[in-house]
Amino acid sequence: MRKSILVTIVMILSSCQMNTSDDFLVIGHRGAMGYVTENTIASVEKAIDLGVSMVEIDVFRIRSGEVVVFHDDRVDDLTNGAGEIEDLYMPDVLALTLQGGHKIPKLQDVLKAVNGRISLNIELKGANTAAKVNQIIEYYSLHQGWSLDQFVISSFRWDELEKMRELNPEVAIAVLTEKDPLDAIPMAEKLGAIAINPWYKNLTQEAVDAIHEKGFKVYTYTVNEAEDIAQMKAMGVDGIFCNYPDRAL
């Protein structure tokens, strides 16, 4: 009898801690980069086809002022070109071909393609990206059918997040960190952020609980294997970034 009561208590506690599929956010990482070349319109479309409600993309501001969707500092590994992405002008970017024959899109290209069907997590990869990105999302919110609450702005560059908050008091912000997740709490509080996004390998149950106690969501990256996905759900995180979104949906 005592054993059955104990088992029941454990099951109840586990169910209280674990996020269910209804409140667990699966974010397509760079679209669905496990299937299609990352940060391309095709990759974003693949993630949408798989059923995500949010996609994460990375952006840089290039030398000619445009905001392009790309992850690496240099174009060498993913394209037929070479050099730092921030040093390029738009004609240089248009001349590049990504793996799989894709092209590097501008942020506006992705917004036009998505057309408000899902939410978008825009990670500010490069310096001096906040102002231009804010200008773009405000325009699309006011004039192109998007809602501001469909955007989340995240970055490891906390100074860029500070600039974004100065420019836009309302847009949702998430603080990215690859270090101790608890160290991000003061910045999240300063920014009025909605979430802290830590590397899953640095995440502990204590950290998840502490972040939740402060009122922030926990969206952790990049979780691809079934065992790790199950572990994150059991720890009560609010969502994950995943290269293969269908594995977690």
Please state what every model-predicted region is.
Residues 4-13:
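Sec-dependent N-terminal signal peptides
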Residues 14-249:
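Phosphate-group recognition and catalysis centered on beta-loop-alpha active-site segments
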